[in-house]
Amino acid sequence: MGDILAHESELLGLVKEYLDFAEFEDTLKTFSKECKVKGKPLCKNVGGPLKKDSKSLVIQRDLVAAFDSGDQKAFFDLWEGHIPSSVRDTDSLAQKLEFYLHIHFAIYLLKYCRGRPDKQELDKRISYFKTYLETKGAALSQTTEFLPFYALPFVPNPMVHPSFKELFQDSWTPELKLKLEKFLALTFKANNTPKLLTIYKENGPNSKELLQQLHQQLVEAERRAMTYLKRYNKIQADYHNLIGVTAELVDSLEATVSGKMITPEYLQSVCVRLFSNQMRQSLAHSVDFTRPGTASTMLRASLAPEKLKDVPLLPSLDYEKLKKDLIWGSDRLKAFLLQALRWRLTTSHPGEQRETVLQAYISNDLLDCHSHNQRSVLQLLHSKSEAVRQYMARLINALASLAEGRLYLAQNTKVLRMLEGRLKEEDKDVITRENVLGALQKFSLRRPLQTAMIRDGLIFWLIDLLKDPDCLSDYTLEYSVALLMNLCLRSAGKNMCAKVAGLMLKVLSDLLGHENHEIQPYVNGALYSILSIPSIREEARAMGMEDILRCFIKEGNAEMIRQIEFIIKQLNSEDLLDGVLESDDDEDEDDEEDHDIMEADLDKDELIQPQLGELSGEKLLTTEYLGIMTNTGKARRKGPASVQWSGDEPLRRPVTPGGHRTGCPVLGDHLISPQNAQQARNGCLRAMPVAHPDDYKEGKPGVTGCGTSSSFMDHKPREWSPAGHQKSRLVPTAALGWPREMTQDPSSGHITREFVPAFTCKPQVPSTPETVEQNPLKAKALSLAPQFSSSGPQQASRPASTASSTRGLHSSQSIRK
């Protein structure tokens, strides 16, 4: 009761203000009379003086009238008296408008005075404007838009000065008047809001929910920031340690040139600094530093990822009930279910847990891909609800990120047709289109779907989309260019491009100079591929493509320069390369890239948020849709070409951007444990297995780059020296290789052709090793494995397996005599 008495005057004032605002005139009179009878004081300054609509209109009319008549004093008296200072001093729109209003009154006599204007009055207005510029208007002096007008008071005849030509056009004053009227309407409408209504809005249920959501997001952001900070500090410390050790090793190598020996004690001290903590204690007892190869074996063993605890499987679900609610439920329920199903897939641990989730979706035909009913889950892609359409596209994109998911979606062409239709129709929701495009790009890893997309004219749609790349998000740009490149790898795709050769070449040449450097490998790949068609080469020469490319050689980095040089070589070639297949349009499934790329963009910018007490995510699934034994295991399909290729077939493998968008590639689940895959996603991938140089001979293609086996052209066996096969591979992430010129090994006399990755991914995680640039003059000496003398014990060959603790990094060269 004491609190009420302390604030009784303000509370009664709020009620009076609201009754006045709502025009309850009789009620207001009765209320005021009763307050007076009871001796209750009414606060007169609750929310400032209440401006009723009628009074506001009068003020607005007076301001506009003063504007029209050029009455500067009357206008600014009303302006300063009725526009709150908080608005005039802090609102950028109000400040800009006031600046132009001062210009209007300063030049009013010059524009509207018949005959010669009164010099004294004109000087007075110019002086007033000059004073404004030196005081309040000085805040805008650094703005480019207003900078020329600071010279206005000093120009003898502004009407003929080119800088002020716009001010004296007939349209300038009406446009300024319209801006003034809009500003006044918004300002006085805001001032009319009673404080009681403002308090209600600020403390309503929506505000509480919003505050709760913001608080939750803040907590999560702080938690992630701390995690990333710890990772960063560890990576930085490891980097500094590595640089220090490298510097010492360089000094030691220089010393050995002059004949100085390296002692075992020094080698031991270096290895101790490189080994992980768990091995340092036993290092002195387990490593014989006098025997070559022992230390390197122990070092590689120390870098092997630790085994983590087994991850439990997620509970089974009632998929019949799930699909029923996805078809017949409310739009909000559909959106939450689609979100939860996606989260179950994207947040599961790579390996058995994720495979079990995926196989449950497939075996229960979650999306009704095999259903012929009129209403199916797939139809949600064309829902009237924006949230449902977007979340359906996100789920399909997540499924397409996994090899088995792509196989499930590809078994029925209606999924592809629906995605193509949604892609061309979706013009409202950017995220929906991004996810549809991402799914189609991943579909392009499969040859039958490539063929279907080429036949459907998707290349023409992509070319039209990429004509204005600055209007596209980074995701849309990268995935559309990567999709275009994948389709251009096929003969049918190249022939499609030949129909619009001029436009295609113009779009690609424009993309070469785009600020998003992530698209460069795909642009170069597409350009190199289509230039194998003679008609496109002729068109490129006619438009001066070589000069355009040489401009980028001057500005690009070494990798970009190397790629462009080979494109120029292709451009200037007269005949098709030897060894080109007559047709690459067979539909064999062994072109499938059997890899999984679950990029972080799948869960970005969630459109819906649960209200208080509303279930979402895994809690929604396990509370309302718990099932019995619907998680059925199934062995992963392993195509013979998923790991290696025959010597007769050229490397023609499509790629997807997702692998390097997430920072580092994710290892194939069937090749590594779920613990290792999770560490790879977290940026803890320690070593990247590459191929043995002894495994390859001339003309025998294999796997290059970041563990990929992808190429973008037909090639001569003698022109290209591939890097060979790889027993266990990483996810293909846009790694396409270029050969270097032949050099002679000075130590052996053998002719050596190096194969260096030109179209290679750039891992963004410092712990992921990058490809080493090799010197042609020292081809044999640059193997990452240690070199041994003939007298000492030799290191045994180690298979390049991710599961092996004795993995080795060997140079990817092919040597021919």
Curated annotation (Swiss-Prot):
Pfam families: ARMC9_ARM (PF21050), ARMC9_LisH (PF21051), CTLH_Armc9 (PF23138). It is found in: Cytoplasm, Cytoskeleton, Cilium basal body; Cell projection, Cilium; Cytoplasm, Cytoskeleton, Microtubule organizing center, Centrosome, Centriole. GO terms for biological process: cilium assembly; positive regulation of smoothened signaling pathway. Its main location: cytoplasm. Gene3D superfamilies: Leucine-rich Repeat Variant. Residues 204-230 form a coiled coil. Residues 793-807 have a biased composition (Low complexity). PROSITE patterns: LISH (PS50896). Residues 765-774, 808-817 have a biased composition (Polar residues). InterPro entries: ARM-like, ARM-type_fold, ARMC9, ARMC9_ARM_dom, ARMC9_CTLH-like_dom, ARMC9_LisH, LisH. GO terms for cellular component: centriole; ciliary basal body; ciliary tip; cilium; cytoplasm. Residues 637-659, 761-817 are annotated as: Disordered. It comes from the Eukaryota. Keywords: Cell projection, Cilium biogenesis/degradation, Coiled coil, Cytoplasm, Cytoskeleton, Phosphoprotein. Residues 7-39 form the LisH domain. The modification Phosphoserine is found at residue 583. SMART domains: LisH. Interacts with TOGARAM1, CCDC66, CEP104, CSPP1 and CEP290. Interacts with NDUFAF2. Involved in ciliogenesis. It is required for appropriate acetylation and polyglutamylation of ciliary microtubules, and regulation of cilium length. Acts as a positive regulator of hedgehog (Hh) signaling. May participate in the trafficking and/or retention of GLI2 and GLI3 proteins at the ciliary tip. This is LisH domain-containing protein ARMC9. It comes from Mus musculus.
